[in-house]
Regions:
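Membrane-embedded alpha-helical bundles of polytopic integral membrane proteins
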Residues: 1-224
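Juxtamembrane interface at the ends
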Residues: 161-162, 166-167, 238-246
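Short, conserved aromatic-histidine micro-motifs
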Residues: 209-217, 256-258, 263, 282-283
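Transmembrane alpha-helix interface/packing and boundary motifs in multi-pass membrane proteins
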Residues: 225-230
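Interfacial loop-to-transmembrane junctions
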Residues: 242-265
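C-terminal-most transmembrane helix of multi-pass membrane proteins
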Residues: 269-270
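Juxtamembrane boundary at the C-terminal end of a transmembrane helix
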Residues: 275-283
Length: 283
């Protein structure tokens, strides 16, 4: 079976699982708790291959998964804010443990440990902020439309950028880090996303899924934010891999590489979407 077929099958299954997972809050939580764990495990495994680095892979992964579930519990109104105390204790432990580990460069261990939480676990956890919101009656409601739309915009951007870049690409976007990306592709991808955002607004209005109450221009703004920060997220992961001297972050997804390869764009796009939507509430 050639790589194109493998990549296509993996991609279709990936999209199907992700879309299905968003339809139910329990399924979403379970799916992204797993994705968070696999991603933190992958990240810590990669940095541990660097000379002098020895991050506690198991505890970092457990901490990342716990943080995701804690944010989910808090955002859904199931648990109080005290749910974060065990996570904070774990972070303190990971810092103090370096005093006794006698590693040659504890600063690197601290930095990579915190990066596994800030760069990987935190963005995935912010999906809960997008999915759960307080209702007028005092209860907490779940809506899949915004978190799912973030991923739809990222997929549309990838496809649009690839098509436009292949046909029109002449000016390199960031040749030092990602030689294959062009300005033409990035702009084309952004235009596709803006059109897709208008489509999401129309369909959500028609079928009653626009729980967040965004108008068409606010949806288009969200699409633009996701496009810009998604592109930066892609470039950040490319820089990370170049620094480590690797092509793919892993091989868990046949034809697509590792978890970080598949979710790189979302790691900056999700927090940016949260900030954008919060900013709208202040205007």
């Amino acid at each position: 079976m050639n790589n194109f077929v493998v990549r296509t099958i993996t991609g279709v299954l990936f999209v199907a699982v992700l879309v299905t997972g968003f339809l139910d809050p329990i399924a979403m939580s379970a799916l992204f708790a797993l994705i968070t764990g696999l991603s933190v495990w992958e990240f810590t495994g990669l940095v541990n291959n660097r000379q002098g680095v020895s991050v506690n892979r198991f505890i970092s992964t457990v901490a990342g998964v716990y943080f995701f579930l804690a944010v989910m519990g808090f955002c859904s109104g199931v648990t109080p804010s005290t749910v974060f105390i065990p996570y904070l204790i774990t972070i303190v432990y990971l810092m103090v443990a370096e005093l006794y580990a006698k590693n040659e460069d504890p600063i690197h261990d601290w930095a990579y440990t915190m990066m596994s939480q800030m760069y990987v676990a935190l963005p995935f956890s912010m999906l809960n902020v997008l999915a759960f919101r307080a209702m007028p009656d005092g209860n907490v409601g779940y809506s899949f439309i915004v978190p799912l739309s973030v991923f739809v915009f990222l997929w549309v951007n990838d496809s649009g950028a690839y098509c436009c870049g292949s046909l029109l690409g002449k000016h390199k976007l960031f040749p030092r880090i990602s030689p294959g990306k062009s300005w033409e592709g990035s702009i084309g991808g952004g235009l596709f996303v803006i059109a897709a955002a208008a489509g999401v607004w129309y369909l959500s209005e028609q079928y009653g899924y626009n729980d967040v109450g965004l108008n068409m221009y606010e949806w288009m703004g969200l699409g633009l934010v996701v496009t810009v920060f998604g592109t930066w997220g892609d470039l950040v992961e490319s820089l990370f891999k170049r620094t480590l001297g690797i092509k793919d972050s892993g091989s868990i997804l046949p034809g697509h590489g590792g978890m970080l390869d598949r979710f790189d764009s979302s790691l900056l796009a999700i927090p940016a979407a949260v900030i954008y939507l919060y900013t709208l509430t202040l205007l």
